[in-house]
């Protein structure tokens, strides 16, 4: 058993496969995800886990060099993202999901609580 950090094996594996500039997303429970994109579904019930809980667990695990957020995203979601942010329409964000390596589905019910992250390098 792992001693600390992420415990979900699918999530650990997906993060380990990321390369520089690969994209991945953290999404609310209502975002339509393209069929060909891997979904790591963490949602249990509405509101659990929250976007913030998932993002806080991920921050120590991944290097991020950029993010994409939809115009309608709440300010509190934007404030959680500790990197340069590109703001696009919600339709453009949904289109960019097709290029993501995976999407982490949370139980978040806040509208537009979706962020696409661009992987950086640790060196």
Swiss-Prot record:
Active site (UniProt): 20 (proton donor)
Pathway: Carbohydrate metabolism; D-ribose degradation; D-ribose 5-phosphate from beta-D-ribopyranose: step 1/2
EC numbers, comma separated: 5.4.99.62
Molecular functions (GO terms): D-ribose pyranase activity; intramolecular lyase activity; monosaccharide binding
Keyword Isomerase: yes
Tree of life domain: Bacteria
Localization terms from the record: Cytoplasm
Catalytic activity: beta-D-ribopyranose = beta-D-ribofuranose
InterPro entries, sorted: D-ribose_pyranase, RbsD-like_sf, RbsD_FucU
A cellular component term, taken from the record's GO annotations: cytosol
Isomerase listed as a keyword: yes
Keyword set, alphabetical order: Carbohydrate metabolism, Cytoplasm, Isomerase
Pfam family, one: RbsD_FucU
Binding-site positions, substrate: 28, 90, 112-114
GO biological process, one term: D-ribose catabolic process
Chief site of localization: cytoplasm
Sequence similarity: Belongs to the RbsD / FucU family. RbsD subfamily.
Subunit structure and binding partners: Homodecamer.
Cited function: Catalyzes the interconversion of beta-pyran and beta-furan forms of D-ribose.
Protein name per its UniProtKB record: D-ribose pyranase
Gene: rbsD
């Amino acid at each position: 058993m792992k001693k600390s950090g992420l415990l979900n094996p699918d999530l650990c594996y997906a993060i380990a496969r990321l390369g520089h500039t690969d994209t991945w997303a953290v999404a609310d429970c209502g975002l339509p995800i393209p069929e060909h994109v891997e979904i790591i579904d963490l949602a249990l019930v509405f509101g659990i886990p929250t976007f913030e809980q998932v993002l806080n667990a991920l921050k120590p695990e991944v290097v991020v060099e950029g993010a994409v957020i939809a115009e309608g995203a709440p300010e509190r979601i934007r404030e959680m993202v500790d990197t340069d942010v590109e703001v696009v329409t919600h339709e453009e964000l949904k289109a960019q999901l097709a290029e993501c390596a995976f999407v982490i589905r949370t139980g978040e019910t806040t509208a537009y609580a979706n962020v696409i992250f661009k992987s950086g390098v640790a060196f």
